[in-house]
């Protein structure tokens, strides 16, 4: 059976294409972010997995949760999550209503096909579609030591020039790399760490 990421791709593309055509890219990103957060919550996911609950009820519950706890910003925890995601709430009530109906139909389809568990992966793929449309890429950089401002700026400039896109760097530190960095952009990984070089040398010597 295909993995969740593979199964989620066509749903994410369909969602992004629809959102892009209807000028609701940010609104859909917000909806998918909240839905993914809910699916990742164990207590709520148990209810979503219950076959006795109808697809209509599940989709309505997810949209209602967004309506009451995010769009109205009544729930501070969800508001903080949305703000951290830099989501943009819809300003037009008419536009918001249209998006709500479309999202409800989308989630209902996933529920009927027993694929609500795909929502976190759908959200991640959706974000990638949006980034590509904006020519913006996420670069996940792991270094042996924290990068200095100069190192970060230089790396970002080089990646942007190489990829011909705006690059957002996400940093983490892993002392086991010994020195250097590893860079992951999409499915591509560049290992320029001392640990990686030592592993390559070991492989060559034992070949």
From Swiss-Prot:
<keyword id="KW-0406">Ion transport</keyword>
<keyword id="KW-1003">Cell membrane</keyword>
<keyword id="KW-0375">Hydrogen ion transport</keyword>
<dbReference type="Pfam" id="PF00213">
    <property type="entry name" value="OSCP"/>
</dbReference>
<dbReference type="InterPro" id="IPR026015">
    <property type="entry name" value="ATP_synth_OSCP/delta_N_sf"/>
</dbReference>
<dbReference type="GO" id="GO:0045259">
    <property type="term" value="C:proton-transporting ATP synthase complex"/>
</dbReference>
<protein>
    <recommendedName>
        <fullName>ATP synthase subunit delta</fullName>
    </recommendedName>
</protein>
<comment type="subunit">
    <text>F-type ATPases have 2 components, F(1) - the catalytic core - and F(0) - the membrane proton channel. F(1) has five subunits: alpha(3), beta(3), gamma(1), delta(1), epsilon(1). F(0) has three main subunits: a(1), b(2) and c(10-14). The alpha and beta chains form an alternating ring which encloses part of the gamma chain. F(1) is attached to F(0) by a central stalk formed by the gamma and epsilon chains, while a peripheral stalk is formed by the delta and b chains.</text>
</comment>
<dbReference type="GO" id="GO:0005886">
    <property type="term" value="C:plasma membrane"/>
</dbReference>
<dbReference type="GO" id="GO:0046933">
    <property type="term" value="F:proton-transporting ATP synthase activity, rotational mechanism"/>
</dbReference>
<comment type="function">
    <text>This protein is part of the stalk that links CF(0) to CF(1). It either transmits conformational changes from CF(0) to CF(1) or is implicated in proton conduction.</text>
</comment>
<keyword id="KW-0472">Membrane</keyword>
<keyword id="KW-0997">Cell inner membrane</keyword>
<keyword id="KW-0139">CF(1)</keyword>
<comment type="similarity">
    <text>Belongs to the ATPase delta chain family.</text>
</comment>
<dbReference type="InterPro" id="IPR020781">
    <property type="entry name" value="ATPase_OSCP/d_CS"/>
</dbReference>
<keyword id="KW-0813">Transport</keyword>
<dbReference type="InterPro" id="IPR000711">
    <property type="entry name" value="ATPase_OSCP/dsu"/>
</dbReference>
<comment type="function">
    <text>F(1)F(0) ATP synthase produces ATP from ADP in the presence of a proton or sodium gradient. F-type ATPases consist of two structural domains, F(1) containing the extramembraneous catalytic core and F(0) containing the membrane proton channel, linked together by a central stalk and a peripheral stalk. During catalysis, ATP synthesis in the catalytic domain of F(1) is coupled via a rotary mechanism of the central stalk subunits to proton translocation.</text>
</comment>
<keyword id="KW-0066">ATP synthesis</keyword>
């Amino acid at each position: 059976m295909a993995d969740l990421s593979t199964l989620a791709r066509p749903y994410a593309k369909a969602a992004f294409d629809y959102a892009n055509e209807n000028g609701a890219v940010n609104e859909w990103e917000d909806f998918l972010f909240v839905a993914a957060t809910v699916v990742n919550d164990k207590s709520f996911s148990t209810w979503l997995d219950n076959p006795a609950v109808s697809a209509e009820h599940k989709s309505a519950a997810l949209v209602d949760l967004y309506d009451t706890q995010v769009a109205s910003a009544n729930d501070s925890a969800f508001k903080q999550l949305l703000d951290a995601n830099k989501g943009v709430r819809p300003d037009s009530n008419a536009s918001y209503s249209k998006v709500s109906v479309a999202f409800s139909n989308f989630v209902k389809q996933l529920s009927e096909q027993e694929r609500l568990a795909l929502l976190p992966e759908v959200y991640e793929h959706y974000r990638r579609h949006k980034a590509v449309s904006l020519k913006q890429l996420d670069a996940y950089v792991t270094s042996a030591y924290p990068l200095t401002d100069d190192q970060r700026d230089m790396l970002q400039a080089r990646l942007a020039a190489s990829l011909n896109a705006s690059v957002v760097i996400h940093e983490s530190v892993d002392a086991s790399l010994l020195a250097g960095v590893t860079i992951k952009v999409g499915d591509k990984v560049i290992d320029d760490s001392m640990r990686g070089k030592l592993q390559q040398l070991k492989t060559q010597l034992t070949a």
